């Protein structure tokens, strides 16, 4: 017994949307919108660009540290600001702006941060989920079964999504995030 049934699939229609893009190192990088995690990669590139990543040794510990810290900041902003733009206002212009990422990049030091540090964007409220730093976990999810981590043995879900890309030998491709 799965989570989807025939009616779910019969009523579904594919949609098309323009990708969210960022120009980096002469390339145009395209990702899905803020209903996905796509903008995290774009913001990470924006942060690294502001810090001069092109001049770093890509096999150095400093490179790995700074990329990791940039990812932490971008993921913190994802937690605070992302959502489906059909339902919430998402400050994408600010999150990907040069000015915002220049200021955010100054938060990266030689020491690893253990804090979840979303940035502050004028006119937008930071919306953070509850976070248990003790590592005990949430009892509500102790009944989850093997396989898809968000589905309990009873077929109940907690609302997460999944993503699949399929390319066949003829070059036909589908990319779906339900």
Where are these regions (language model features)?
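Long, well-ordered, tryptophan-enriched scaffold segments
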Residues: 1-29, 34
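Internal maturation/activation junctions in enzymes
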Residues: 2, 53-178
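Flexible, polar/acidic helix-loop-strand segments at domain edges
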Residues: 39
